[in-house]
Amino acid sequence: MFQAILAIIPILWLILSLAVFRMRGDLACFIGLIITLLTSIIGFHFSIKDGLTAGLEGAMMGFWPIIYIIVAAVFTYNLTTASGGMTVIKRLLMTITEDKRILVLILAWGFGGFLEAIAGFGTAVAIPASILVALGMKPLRAALICLIANTTPTAFGAIGLPVTTLAQVTGLEVKQLSVIVSLQLFILIVAIPFVLVSLTGEGKRPIKGVFGITLASGLAFALPQILVSNYVGAELPSIIGSLFCILVTILFVNLRERGKNASPVGGDVAFKEGIIRCLPFILVFFFIMLTSSLFPAINQLLAKVSTTVSIYTGEHAKPYTIKWLTSPGTMIILATFIAGLIQGMSFKEIGSILAKVLNKLTKTMVTVASIVALSKVMSYSGMINTIAVSLVAVTGGFYPFIAPVIGTLGTFITGSDTSANVLFGELQVKAANNLNMNPYWMAAQYDRGNCRKNDFASKHCSCSGTYWFRRSRR
Protein backbone atom coordinates (compact mmCIF):
# COMPACT_ATOMS: atom_id res chain seq x y z
CA MET A 1 0.00 0.00 0.00
CA PHE A 2 2.88 2.36 0.83
CA GLN A 3 4.36 1.87 -2.65
CA ALA A 4 0.97 2.54 -4.24
CA ILE A 5 0.81 5.87 -2.39
CA LEU A 6 4.33 6.70 -3.59
CA ALA A 7 3.43 5.73 -7.16
CA ILE A 8 0.53 8.19 -7.39
CA ILE A 9 2.60 11.16 -6.14
CA PRO A 10 3.47 12.33 -9.72
CA ILE A 11 -0.20 12.07 -10.74
CA LEU A 12 -1.32 13.98 -7.64
CA TRP A 13 1.26 16.65 -8.46
CA LEU A 14 -0.14 17.07 -11.98
CA ILE A 15 -3.70 17.32 -10.65
CA LEU A 16 -2.75 19.94 -8.05
CA SER A 17 -0.37 21.96 -10.22
CA LEU A 18 -2.60 22.12 -13.30
CA ALA A 19 -6.15 21.96 -11.94
CA VAL A 20 -5.74 23.70 -8.55
CA PHE A 21 -2.66 25.95 -8.71
CA ARG A 22 -3.19 26.73 -12.45
CA MET A 23 0.52 26.41 -13.10
CA ARG A 24 1.87 26.66 -16.66
CA GLY A 25 1.68 23.29 -18.38
CA ASP A 26 5.34 23.14 -19.42
CA LEU A 27 6.59 24.04 -15.94
CA ALA A 28 4.18 21.71 -14.12
CA CYS A 29 5.04 18.73 -16.32
CA PHE A 30 8.80 19.34 -16.11
CA ILE A 31 8.64 19.53 -12.30
CA GLY A 32 6.45 16.41 -12.42
CA LEU A 33 9.22 14.63 -14.33
CA ILE A 34 11.76 15.57 -11.64
CA ILE A 35 9.39 14.35 -8.90
CA THR A 36 8.87 11.08 -10.79
CA LEU A 37 12.61 10.50 -11.16
CA LEU A 38 13.21 11.11 -7.45
CA THR A 39 10.27 8.90 -6.43
CA SER A 40 11.38 6.05 -8.69
CA ILE A 41 14.95 6.18 -7.39
CA ILE A 42 14.09 6.51 -3.69
CA GLY A 43 10.86 4.53 -3.44
CA PHE A 44 11.26 1.92 -6.19
CA HIS A 45 15.05 1.37 -6.09
CA PHE A 46 15.42 2.48 -9.70
CA SER A 47 19.02 3.30 -10.58
CA ILE A 48 19.91 6.87 -11.53
CA LYS A 49 21.25 5.70 -14.90
CA ASP A 50 18.09 3.74 -15.71
CA GLY A 51 15.92 6.64 -14.58
CA LEU A 52 17.72 9.15 -16.78
CA THR A 53 17.77 6.90 -19.85
CA ALA A 54 14.09 6.01 -19.36
CA GLY A 55 13.30 9.72 -19.27
CA LEU A 56 15.45 10.33 -22.34
CA GLU A 57 13.65 7.59 -24.27
CA GLY A 58 10.33 9.14 -23.28
CA ALA A 59 11.46 12.60 -24.38
CA MET A 60 12.60 11.14 -27.70
CA MET A 61 9.19 9.51 -28.13
CA GLY A 62 7.60 12.85 -27.27
CA PHE A 63 9.49 14.59 -30.05
CA TRP A 64 9.09 11.76 -32.56
CA PRO A 65 6.39 11.27 -33.58
CA ILE A 66 4.09 13.29 -31.26
CA ILE A 67 5.57 16.81 -31.40
CA TYR A 68 6.61 16.29 -35.01
CA ILE A 69 2.99 15.60 -36.03
CA ILE A 70 1.66 18.49 -33.93
CA VAL A 71 4.08 20.93 -35.59
CA ALA A 72 3.21 19.58 -39.04
CA ALA A 73 -0.55 19.82 -38.47
CA VAL A 74 -0.43 23.39 -37.15
CA PHE A 75 1.93 24.31 -40.02
CA THR A 76 -0.65 23.12 -42.56
CA TYR A 77 -3.43 25.06 -40.89
CA ASN A 78 -1.37 28.27 -40.59
CA LEU A 79 -0.22 28.13 -44.22
CA THR A 80 -3.81 27.59 -45.37
CA THR A 81 -4.87 30.61 -43.32
CA ALA A 82 -2.00 32.76 -44.65
CA SER A 83 -2.80 31.86 -48.26
CA GLY A 84 -6.47 32.78 -47.84
CA GLY A 85 -7.63 29.19 -47.96
CA MET A 86 -9.56 29.35 -44.69
CA THR A 87 -11.47 32.40 -45.93
CA VAL A 88 -12.48 30.51 -49.08
CA ILE A 89 -13.56 27.48 -47.02
CA LYS A 90 -15.69 29.77 -44.83
CA ARG A 91 -17.33 31.32 -47.90
CA LEU A 92 -18.06 27.89 -49.33
CA LEU A 93 -19.72 26.72 -46.12
CA MET A 94 -21.70 29.91 -45.44
CA THR A 95 -23.67 29.84 -48.72
CA ILE A 96 -25.33 26.44 -48.37
CA THR A 97 -28.51 27.08 -46.35
CA GLU A 98 -30.14 29.59 -44.02
CA ASP A 99 -31.33 26.92 -41.54
CA LYS A 100 -29.02 27.31 -38.54
CA ARG A 101 -29.63 23.72 -37.44
CA ILE A 102 -28.17 22.42 -40.68
CA LEU A 103 -25.36 24.99 -40.59
CA VAL A 104 -24.42 23.66 -37.15
CA LEU A 105 -24.24 20.13 -38.59
CA ILE A 106 -22.01 21.32 -41.43
CA LEU A 107 -19.85 23.82 -39.52
CA ALA A 108 -19.58 22.62 -35.92
CA TRP A 109 -19.93 18.88 -36.58
CA GLY A 110 -18.54 18.23 -40.07
CA PHE A 111 -16.09 21.10 -40.61
CA GLY A 112 -15.12 21.15 -36.92
CA GLY A 113 -14.46 17.41 -37.08
CA PHE A 114 -12.27 17.95 -40.14
CA LEU A 115 -10.25 20.69 -38.41
CA GLU A 116 -9.80 18.46 -35.35
CA ALA A 117 -8.67 15.61 -37.60
CA ILE A 118 -6.18 17.73 -39.50
CA ALA A 119 -4.87 20.11 -36.83
CA GLY A 120 -6.54 20.06 -33.41
CA PHE A 121 -5.28 22.50 -30.76
CA GLY A 122 -8.56 24.39 -30.40
CA THR A 123 -8.96 25.21 -34.11
CA ALA A 124 -12.00 22.89 -34.26
CA VAL A 125 -13.73 25.09 -31.68
CA ALA A 126 -12.53 28.60 -32.51
CA ILE A 127 -13.08 28.63 -36.29
CA PRO A 128 -16.58 27.07 -36.53
CA ALA A 129 -17.70 29.17 -33.55
CA SER A 130 -16.49 32.37 -35.23
CA ILE A 131 -18.43 31.51 -38.41
CA LEU A 132 -21.60 30.68 -36.46
CA VAL A 133 -21.36 34.00 -34.61
CA ALA A 134 -20.86 35.79 -37.94
CA LEU A 135 -24.08 34.11 -39.09
CA GLY A 136 -25.99 35.58 -36.15
CA MET A 137 -25.72 32.96 -33.40
CA LYS A 138 -25.07 34.14 -29.83
CA PRO A 139 -21.36 33.70 -28.96
CA LEU A 140 -21.91 31.63 -25.81
CA ARG A 141 -24.28 29.22 -27.57
CA ALA A 142 -21.90 28.92 -30.54
CA ALA A 143 -19.00 28.12 -28.20
CA LEU A 144 -21.03 25.51 -26.28
CA ILE A 145 -22.21 23.81 -29.47
CA CYS A 146 -18.68 23.66 -30.90
CA LEU A 147 -17.28 22.31 -27.62
CA ILE A 148 -19.83 19.48 -27.59
CA ALA A 149 -19.24 18.77 -31.28
CA ASN A 150 -15.52 18.46 -30.59
CA THR A 151 -15.78 15.34 -28.43
CA THR A 152 -15.67 12.16 -30.51
CA PRO A 153 -13.46 13.56 -33.34
CA THR A 154 -10.58 13.98 -30.89
CA ALA A 155 -9.92 10.23 -30.72
CA PHE A 156 -8.48 10.43 -34.23
CA GLY A 157 -7.50 14.10 -34.08
CA ALA A 158 -4.25 15.53 -35.46
CA ILE A 159 -3.92 12.72 -38.02
CA GLY A 160 -4.83 9.98 -35.53
CA LEU A 161 -2.21 11.02 -32.99
CA PRO A 162 -4.12 10.05 -29.79
CA VAL A 163 -4.79 6.48 -30.95
CA THR A 164 -1.34 5.94 -32.48
CA THR A 165 0.22 7.24 -29.27
CA LEU A 166 -2.00 5.00 -27.13
CA ALA A 167 -0.97 2.02 -29.26
CA GLN A 168 2.69 2.95 -28.93
CA VAL A 169 2.72 3.35 -25.14
CA THR A 170 0.70 0.18 -24.57
CA GLY A 171 2.32 -2.04 -27.19
CA LEU A 172 -1.05 -2.74 -28.82
CA GLU A 173 -1.50 -3.12 -32.59
CA VAL A 174 -2.65 0.26 -33.87
CA LYS A 175 -5.10 -0.89 -36.56
CA GLN A 176 -6.95 -3.27 -34.25
CA LEU A 177 -7.10 -0.61 -31.54
CA SER A 178 -8.42 1.92 -34.08
CA VAL A 179 -11.28 -0.36 -35.09
CA ILE A 180 -12.36 -0.99 -31.49
CA VAL A 181 -12.19 2.72 -30.65
CA SER A 182 -14.39 3.44 -33.70
CA LEU A 183 -16.90 0.76 -32.69
CA GLN A 184 -17.14 2.06 -29.13
CA LEU A 185 -17.67 5.62 -30.39
CA PHE A 186 -20.37 4.65 -32.91
CA ILE A 187 -23.44 5.38 -30.75
CA LEU A 188 -21.98 8.66 -29.48
CA ILE A 189 -21.15 9.80 -33.02
CA VAL A 190 -24.71 9.15 -34.17
CA ALA A 191 -26.21 10.79 -31.06
CA ILE A 192 -24.16 14.01 -30.89
CA PRO A 193 -25.69 15.63 -34.03
CA PHE A 194 -29.12 15.34 -32.37
CA VAL A 195 -27.76 17.09 -29.28
CA LEU A 196 -26.31 19.87 -31.43
CA VAL A 197 -29.55 20.38 -33.35
CA SER A 198 -31.54 20.40 -30.09
CA LEU A 199 -29.30 23.13 -28.71
CA THR A 200 -29.63 25.16 -31.92
CA GLY A 201 -33.33 24.85 -32.67
CA GLU A 202 -36.02 27.03 -31.16
CA GLY A 203 -39.31 25.83 -29.67
CA LYS A 204 -40.38 22.50 -28.19
CA ARG A 205 -39.55 20.38 -31.25
CA PRO A 206 -36.13 21.51 -32.52
CA ILE A 207 -35.61 18.28 -34.49
CA LYS A 208 -38.78 18.76 -36.56
CA GLY A 209 -38.02 18.83 -40.27
CA VAL A 210 -34.35 17.85 -39.94
CA PHE A 211 -34.49 14.38 -38.34
CA GLY A 212 -33.39 12.61 -41.53
CA ILE A 213 -30.54 15.04 -42.22
CA THR A 214 -29.37 14.81 -38.60
CA LEU A 215 -29.37 11.01 -38.64
CA ALA A 216 -27.59 10.95 -42.01
CA SER A 217 -24.97 13.40 -40.69
CA GLY A 218 -24.14 11.11 -37.77
CA LEU A 219 -24.11 7.89 -39.79
CA ALA A 220 -22.04 9.52 -42.56
CA PHE A 221 -19.36 10.28 -39.96
CA ALA A 222 -19.53 7.00 -38.02
CA LEU A 223 -19.65 4.34 -40.74
CA PRO A 224 -16.70 5.55 -42.89
CA GLN A 225 -14.67 5.98 -39.69
CA ILE A 226 -15.11 2.28 -38.85
CA LEU A 227 -14.24 1.17 -42.39
CA VAL A 228 -11.15 3.40 -42.63
CA SER A 229 -9.96 2.27 -39.18
CA ASN A 230 -10.19 -1.33 -40.31
CA TYR A 231 -8.49 -0.99 -43.69
CA VAL A 232 -6.12 1.97 -43.29
CA GLY A 233 -5.38 2.65 -39.62
CA ALA A 234 -5.62 5.57 -37.22
CA GLU A 235 -4.46 8.42 -39.46
CA LEU A 236 -7.50 8.99 -41.68
CA PRO A 237 -10.76 7.91 -39.93
CA SER A 238 -11.80 11.37 -38.73
CA ILE A 239 -10.62 13.07 -41.92
CA ILE A 240 -12.66 10.81 -44.20
CA GLY A 241 -15.56 10.59 -41.73
CA SER A 242 -15.86 14.37 -41.47
CA LEU A 243 -15.60 14.87 -45.25
CA PHE A 244 -18.30 12.26 -45.87
CA CYS A 245 -20.41 13.93 -43.20
CA ILE A 246 -20.13 17.33 -44.90
CA LEU A 247 -20.84 15.92 -48.38
CA VAL A 248 -23.83 13.82 -47.29
CA THR A 249 -25.33 16.68 -45.27
CA ILE A 250 -24.97 19.08 -48.22
CA LEU A 251 -26.49 16.46 -50.54
CA PHE A 252 -29.51 16.09 -48.26
CA VAL A 253 -29.85 19.89 -48.08
CA ASN A 254 -29.83 20.14 -51.89
CA LEU A 255 -32.49 17.43 -52.15
CA ARG A 256 -34.57 19.13 -49.47
CA GLU A 257 -34.33 22.62 -50.96
CA ARG A 258 -34.65 21.61 -54.60
CA GLY A 259 -36.96 24.03 -56.29
CA LYS A 260 -36.47 26.72 -53.68
CA ASN A 261 -34.57 29.94 -54.39
CA ALA A 262 -31.55 28.84 -52.39
CA SER A 263 -28.06 30.16 -52.89
CA PRO A 264 -25.86 27.80 -54.90
CA VAL A 265 -23.28 25.88 -52.96
CA GLY A 266 -20.01 27.76 -53.07
CA GLY A 267 -21.56 31.11 -54.00
CA ASP A 268 -19.08 33.23 -55.92
CA VAL A 269 -16.13 30.90 -55.30
CA ALA A 270 -14.84 29.48 -58.58
CA PHE A 271 -14.18 25.74 -58.65
CA LYS A 272 -10.50 26.21 -59.55
CA GLU A 273 -9.98 28.75 -56.77
CA GLY A 274 -11.62 26.44 -54.26
CA ILE A 275 -9.33 23.55 -55.23
CA ILE A 276 -6.17 25.71 -55.13
CA ARG A 277 -6.97 27.22 -51.74
CA CYS A 278 -7.88 23.86 -50.22
CA LEU A 279 -4.83 22.17 -51.78
CA PRO A 280 -2.81 21.73 -48.52
CA PHE A 281 -5.60 19.61 -47.01
CA ILE A 282 -6.19 17.74 -50.27
CA LEU A 283 -2.50 16.82 -50.65
CA VAL A 284 -2.20 15.86 -46.96
CA PHE A 285 -5.13 13.49 -47.42
CA PHE A 286 -3.67 11.80 -50.52
CA PHE A 287 -0.08 11.67 -49.24
CA ILE A 288 -1.08 10.01 -45.98
CA MET A 289 -3.40 7.58 -47.74
CA LEU A 290 -0.78 6.60 -50.36
CA THR A 291 1.91 5.95 -47.73
CA SER A 292 -0.41 4.04 -45.37
CA SER A 293 -0.74 0.27 -45.11
CA LEU A 294 -3.53 0.52 -47.70
CA PHE A 295 -0.69 0.58 -50.26
CA PRO A 296 1.78 -1.95 -48.79
CA ALA A 297 4.36 -1.69 -51.60
CA ILE A 298 4.85 2.06 -51.02
CA ASN A 299 4.55 1.75 -47.25
CA GLN A 300 7.14 -1.02 -46.95
CA LEU A 301 9.57 0.73 -49.30
CA LEU A 302 9.45 4.00 -47.33
CA ALA A 303 9.58 2.15 -43.99
CA LYS A 304 13.07 0.93 -44.86
CA VAL A 305 14.38 4.47 -44.35
CA SER A 306 14.69 4.28 -40.58
CA THR A 307 17.09 4.75 -37.68
CA THR A 308 17.26 2.44 -34.66
CA VAL A 309 18.86 3.57 -31.39
CA SER A 310 19.20 2.00 -27.94
CA ILE A 311 18.44 4.52 -25.21
CA TYR A 312 17.06 2.85 -22.08
CA THR A 313 19.68 0.82 -20.21
CA GLY A 314 17.52 -1.18 -17.79
CA GLU A 315 15.57 -4.42 -17.90
CA HIS A 316 13.18 -5.10 -20.80
CA ALA A 317 14.92 -2.43 -22.89
CA LYS A 318 13.98 -2.32 -26.56
CA PRO A 319 15.65 -0.32 -29.35
CA TYR A 320 13.75 2.79 -30.40
CA THR A 321 13.09 3.05 -34.15
CA ILE A 322 12.45 6.27 -36.05
CA LYS A 323 10.74 5.76 -39.41
CA TRP A 324 11.55 8.95 -41.25
CA LEU A 325 9.35 8.73 -44.34
CA THR A 326 6.24 6.86 -43.15
CA SER A 327 5.59 9.29 -40.31
CA PRO A 328 2.44 11.35 -40.95
CA GLY A 329 4.47 14.40 -39.91
CA THR A 330 6.82 14.01 -42.88
CA MET A 331 3.94 13.59 -45.33
CA ILE A 332 2.07 16.58 -43.89
CA ILE A 333 5.09 18.91 -44.10
CA LEU A 334 5.94 17.72 -47.63
CA ALA A 335 2.34 18.15 -48.80
CA THR A 336 2.12 21.60 -47.24
CA PHE A 337 5.37 22.81 -48.85
CA ILE A 338 4.23 21.58 -52.28
CA ALA A 339 0.79 23.15 -51.85
CA GLY A 340 2.32 26.46 -50.77
CA LEU A 341 4.58 26.56 -53.83
CA ILE A 342 1.65 25.77 -56.15
CA GLN A 343 -0.33 28.58 -54.52
CA GLY A 344 2.47 31.00 -55.43
CA MET A 345 4.22 31.34 -52.09
CA SER A 346 8.02 31.43 -51.96
CA PHE A 347 10.28 29.07 -49.99
CA LYS A 348 11.09 32.02 -47.73
CA GLU A 349 7.41 32.69 -46.96
CA ILE A 350 6.68 29.02 -46.30
CA GLY A 351 9.81 28.68 -44.16
CA SER A 352 8.79 31.76 -42.19
CA ILE A 353 5.39 30.24 -41.40
CA LEU A 354 7.05 27.02 -40.22
CA ALA A 355 9.53 28.97 -38.07
CA LYS A 356 6.67 30.86 -36.41
CA VAL A 357 4.91 27.57 -35.67
CA LEU A 358 8.05 26.16 -34.05
CA ASN A 359 8.43 29.29 -31.96
CA LYS A 360 4.77 29.31 -30.93
CA LEU A 361 4.82 25.64 -29.88
CA THR A 362 7.99 25.79 -27.75
CA LYS A 363 6.12 25.43 -24.45
CA THR A 364 3.96 22.68 -25.94
CA MET A 365 7.13 20.79 -26.88
CA VAL A 366 8.41 20.98 -23.29
CA THR A 367 5.02 19.86 -21.97
CA VAL A 368 4.71 16.86 -24.28
CA ALA A 369 8.34 15.75 -23.92
CA SER A 370 8.13 16.01 -20.12
CA ILE A 371 4.87 14.12 -19.76
CA VAL A 372 5.99 11.29 -22.08
CA ALA A 373 9.31 11.08 -20.21
CA LEU A 374 7.40 11.01 -16.91
CA SER A 375 5.21 8.19 -18.22
CA LYS A 376 8.23 6.13 -19.34
CA VAL A 377 9.95 6.48 -15.97
CA MET A 378 6.74 5.40 -14.20
CA SER A 379 6.40 2.45 -16.57
CA TYR A 380 9.97 1.12 -16.42
CA SER A 381 10.32 1.61 -12.65
CA GLY A 382 7.17 -0.40 -11.89
CA MET A 383 5.07 2.52 -10.66
CA ILE A 384 2.34 2.00 -13.28
CA ASN A 385 2.13 -1.70 -12.48
CA THR A 386 1.83 -0.92 -8.75
CA ILE A 387 -1.05 1.49 -9.40
CA ALA A 388 -2.78 -1.03 -11.68
CA VAL A 389 -2.56 -3.86 -9.15
CA SER A 390 -3.86 -1.59 -6.39
CA LEU A 391 -6.77 -0.29 -8.48
CA VAL A 392 -7.80 -3.80 -9.50
CA ALA A 393 -7.55 -4.97 -5.87
CA VAL A 394 -9.80 -2.11 -4.72
CA THR A 395 -12.34 -2.06 -7.57
CA GLY A 396 -12.22 -5.67 -8.77
CA GLY A 397 -14.60 -6.40 -11.64
CA PHE A 398 -15.89 -2.82 -11.54
CA TYR A 399 -12.63 -1.46 -12.96
CA PRO A 400 -13.91 -1.33 -16.58
CA PHE A 401 -16.47 1.23 -15.37
CA ILE A 402 -13.67 3.22 -13.74
CA ALA A 403 -11.45 3.31 -16.88
CA PRO A 404 -13.47 6.02 -18.72
CA VAL A 405 -13.47 8.12 -15.54
CA ILE A 406 -9.67 7.92 -15.47
CA GLY A 407 -9.65 8.99 -19.12
CA THR A 408 -11.92 11.90 -18.27
CA LEU A 409 -9.61 12.94 -15.43
CA GLY A 410 -6.50 12.60 -17.60
CA THR A 411 -7.84 14.82 -20.38
CA PHE A 412 -9.11 17.42 -17.92
CA ILE A 413 -5.70 17.55 -16.18
CA THR A 414 -3.47 17.62 -19.27
CA GLY A 415 -5.87 19.35 -21.69
CA SER A 416 -5.04 16.76 -24.33
CA ASP A 417 -6.31 13.32 -25.35
CA THR A 418 -2.79 12.42 -26.52
CA SER A 419 -1.11 13.45 -23.25
CA ALA A 420 -3.75 11.60 -21.23
CA ASN A 421 -3.11 8.46 -23.29
CA VAL A 422 0.60 8.75 -22.57
CA LEU A 423 -0.03 9.28 -18.86
CA PHE A 424 -2.59 6.54 -18.18
CA GLY A 425 -2.61 4.35 -21.32
CA GLU A 426 -0.34 1.58 -20.06
CA LEU A 427 -2.27 1.48 -16.80
CA GLN A 428 -5.33 0.24 -18.71
CA VAL A 429 -3.46 -2.66 -20.31
CA LYS A 430 -1.91 -3.67 -16.98
CA ALA A 431 -5.34 -3.60 -15.33
CA ALA A 432 -6.90 -5.59 -18.19
CA ASN A 433 -4.20 -8.25 -17.93
CA ASN A 434 -4.70 -8.51 -14.17
CA LEU A 435 -8.45 -9.00 -14.73
CA ASN A 436 -7.91 -11.41 -17.67
CA MET A 437 -9.80 -9.02 -19.95
CA ASN A 438 -9.19 -7.91 -23.54
CA PRO A 439 -6.63 -5.06 -23.34
CA TYR A 440 -7.86 -3.55 -26.63
CA TRP A 441 -11.39 -3.08 -25.33
CA MET A 442 -10.11 -1.69 -22.02
CA ALA A 443 -7.79 0.80 -23.75
CA ALA A 444 -10.58 1.85 -26.13
CA GLN A 445 -13.00 2.23 -23.22
CA TYR A 446 -10.48 4.48 -21.52
CA ASP A 447 -9.98 6.55 -24.69
CA ARG A 448 -13.75 6.99 -24.94
CA GLY A 449 -13.62 8.66 -21.55
CA ASN A 450 -10.94 11.00 -22.91
CA CYS A 451 -13.28 12.07 -25.70
CA ARG A 452 -16.14 12.75 -23.31
CA LYS A 453 -14.08 15.18 -21.29
CA ASN A 454 -12.21 16.76 -24.18
CA ASP A 455 -14.94 19.38 -24.59
CA PHE A 456 -13.96 20.77 -21.19
CA ALA A 457 -10.19 20.40 -21.62
CA SER A 458 -8.36 23.57 -20.73
CA LYS A 459 -7.20 24.48 -24.24
CA HIS A 460 -10.68 24.20 -25.72
CA CYS A 461 -12.47 26.07 -22.93
CA SER A 462 -9.89 28.85 -23.01
CA CYS A 463 -10.07 29.05 -26.80
CA SER A 464 -13.86 29.33 -26.95
CA GLY A 465 -14.04 31.44 -23.81
CA THR A 466 -11.54 33.98 -25.11
CA TYR A 467 -13.47 34.34 -28.35
CA TRP A 468 -16.80 34.76 -26.52
CA PHE A 469 -15.25 37.38 -24.20
CA ARG A 470 -13.89 39.40 -27.11
CA ARG A 471 -17.25 39.35 -28.91
CA SER A 472 -19.18 40.33 -25.78
CA ARG A 473 -16.87 43.32 -25.21
CA ARG A 474 -17.57 44.78 -28.66
Curated annotation (Swiss-Prot):
Where is this chain's protein located in or outside the cell?
Cell membrane
Q: Name one GO cellular component term.
A: plasma membrane
Its membrane topology = Multi-pass membrane protein
Q: Which UniProt keywords apply?
A: Cell membrane, Membrane, Transmembrane, Transmembrane helix, Transport
One MF term in the entry's GO annotations: lactate transmembrane transporter activity
Q: According to the lineage, what is the superkingdom?
A: Bacteria
Similarity comment: family membership? Belongs to the lactate permease family.
- Function statement: Plays a role in L-lactate utilization.
Record-given protein name:
L-lactate permease
